[in-house]
């Protein structure tokens, strides 16, 4: 089922929420309608957690997640970290990462098996991504863009990549990820996915 939703008149709902097959994160301080829509649709299946990251309502660009784990930036407070650990299922590992590229959601795109990462991430960060999320990690660009998490969204069943991704790159990425991909836009033409 598809539901149209905005966060304070902003259609970029992925900035203010993040969803996996195991849990959903929703920004605190938004309208009750925004949160209640997630709760109505998902609460019977997975926990829906109101949270902030690094004292902000910006969730999507700051976190990297799958059903196995949640990676948060070093700017995440101890209180936020404890709140996430208390609210998420015990099977989900929550890990704060000491990485200078702190907008993890913009730098990493992942599903439950593979992560594509910004090519400048530290090796230690790549190892944490592999360990916490239980994925294979590949440094990659999408249509020449290093912010792979901004220009690619992948699930275990498929993905959407930047509209200027070449056919050759699309085929190579699809083979690497083992899921079908399509090049396109969101929100009436935005290349940032």
From Swiss-Prot:
Main location: cytoplasm
Single GO biological process annotation from the record: cytosolic ribosome assembly
Organism domain of life: Eukaryota
GO molecular function per UniProt: ribosome binding; translation initiation factor activity
Subcellular localization: Cytoplasm; Nucleus, Nucleolus
Pfam families listed in its UniProt record: eIF-6
Keyword terms: Cytoplasm, Initiation factor, Nucleus, Protein biosynthesis, Ribosome biogenesis
This protein's GO CC annotations: cytoplasm; nucleolus
UniProt cross-references to CDD domains, sorted A to Z: IF6
Function: Binds to the 60S ribosomal subunit and prevents its association with the 40S ribosomal subunit to form the 80S initiation complex in the cytoplasm. May also be involved in ribosome biogenesis.
Family designation: Belongs to the eIF-6 family.
Record HAMAP family: eIF_6
Subunit structure: Monomer. Associates with the 60S ribosomal subunit.
Name of the protein in question: Eukaryotic translation initiation factor 6
Organism: Beta vulgaris (Sugar beet)
């Amino acid at each position: 089922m598809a539901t149209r939703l905005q966060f304070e008149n902003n259609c970029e709902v992925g900035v203010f929420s993040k969803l996996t097959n195991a849990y959903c994160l929703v920004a605190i301080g938004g309208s009750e309608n925004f949160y209640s829509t997630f709760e109505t649709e998902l609460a019977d299946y997975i926990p829906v957690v109101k949270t902030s990251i690094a004292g902000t309502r910006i969730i999507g660009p700051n976190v990297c997640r799958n059903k196995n784990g949640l990676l948060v930036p070093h700017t995440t407070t101890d209180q936020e970290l404890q709140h996430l650990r208390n609210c998420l299922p015990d099977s989900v590992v929550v890990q704060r990462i000491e990485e200078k590229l702190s907008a993890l959601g913009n730098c990493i795109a992942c599903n439950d098996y593979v992560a594509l990462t910004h090519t400048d991430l530290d090796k230690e960060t790549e190892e944490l991504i592999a360990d916490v999320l239980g994925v294979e990690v590949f440094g990659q660009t999408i249509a020449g863009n290093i912010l792979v998490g901004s220009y690619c969204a992948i699930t275990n069943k498929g993905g959407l990549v930047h509209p200027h991704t070449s056919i050759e790159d699309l085929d190579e990425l699809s083979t690497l990820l083992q899921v079908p991909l399509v090049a396109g836009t969101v929100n009436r033409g935005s290349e940032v996915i």
